[in-house]
Amino acid sequence: MEITTINQLIAAGSGLIGACIGAGISGWINFRISRSNHDIEKLSFAAGFVAEVESLQKVMRERGYLEAFTSLSNDPDIVAGAKVHYTILIPDNFSRFYNANLNKVGLLGVDRTKLLVQYHQVLQALAQDFKEGSYVNMNGFDKEAIDECIRFFSLALSIGDQIVNYEVGN
């Protein structure tokens, strides 16, 4: 082989190796940027979901719904079979962030996603009892319906607390 051919092969090989190294570094940098953006997105949505749960928890606690129903459950007239009408105005869109970002719920991980979906399903079940035209809205809450609301308010508050106090390492 001639010297010029060897020099050309060395130059071509060096160029090819350099291109491979450059592509590898570029790919790694793009991967890191993409991963960083994904992590930021996860944190952002997690913060939004948790903030909404905290707000809903605060409203339920500040308004004393659980305590009110517990008091009603122990009322002698209710125990004797009377019914009571109890109204809570619940907007259809009480969980706006959750509804607007349902496609991002999975970013929270399996356990936290499960809790978040359960939480909102329990709240939806509660909200149905207070909707205009629902059976208990029209006929009143008897002891059984009141006790069911107590269970659902307790369950919602318990699940909500688990979401708010969830440790990411779990």
Name these PLM-found stretches.
Residues 47-170:
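Interfacial alpha-helical end/capping and short helix-turn segments at domain and membrane boundaries
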Residues 32-54:
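Juxtamembrane membrane-water interface segments immediately C-terminal to a transmembrane helix
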Residues 1-36:
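Membrane-embedded hydrophobic alpha-helical segments
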